[in-house]
UniProtKB/Swiss-Prot annotation:
Gene name of the encoded protein: eif5a
Any GO molecular function: translation elongation factor activity
Role played: Functions by promoting the formation of the first peptide bond.
Classification via CDD domains: S1_aIF5A
Top-level taxon of the source organism: Archaea
Lineage: Archaea, Thermoproteota, Thermoprotei, Sulfolobales, Sulfolobaceae
Name of the featured protein: Translation initiation factor 5A
Keyword Protein biosynthesis: yes
SUPFAM superfamilies the record matches: Nucleic acid-binding proteins, Translation proteins SH3-like domain
Keywords for this protein: Cytoplasm, Hypusine, Initiation factor, Protein biosynthesis
PANTHER family: TRANSLATION INITIATION FACTOR 5A FAMILY MEMBER
Length: 131
């Protein structure tokens, strides 16, 4: 569970943030100054890394939010088991099963022996691309 903290005002499009316990990639940020004595508010729209679900966060720009630390690794596909793939990390030689991605551009390149890039975020792993 590796996270950092930053303020909502420091978030940029393309950065990552935790919303409702789910790591998300920020796709839109709008900031608005409210009232005479109110503080500026930000509306952050983000898409979940694992679910693909759209999530939003409305908060003051000086509020602290969690930012997940994304660890990028390279692995090799050992076996295709239908819905799952057996992957070997090329640094630690650890083997593990990952769910097969749903993106067509990744699925079309999946074959045993192919090198992949996968991300490890908050104890979960996801295949990002096939090299």
């Amino acid at each position: 569970m590796s996270i950092q903290y930053t303020t909502v005002g420091d978030l940029k499009v393309g950065s990552y943030v935790m919303i409702d316990g789910e790591p998300c990639r920020v796709v839109e940020i709008t900031k608005a100054k409210t009232g005479k004595h109110g503080s500026a508010k930000a509306n952050v729209v983000a898409i979940g890394l694992f679910t693909g679900q759209k999530r939003s966060l409305m908060a003051p720009v000086d509020q602290q939010v969690e930012v997940p630390i994304i660890e990028k690794h390279v692995g090799q596909i050992l076996a295709d088991k239908g819905d799952n793939l057996t992957i070997m990390d090329l640094e630690s030689y650890e083997t593990f099963d990952l769910e097969k991605p749903t993106e067509n551009e990744i699925v079309s390149k999946i074959r045993p022996g192919a090198e992949i890039e996968y991300w490890s975020v908050m104890g979960r792993r996801k295949i990002v691309r096939v090299k």
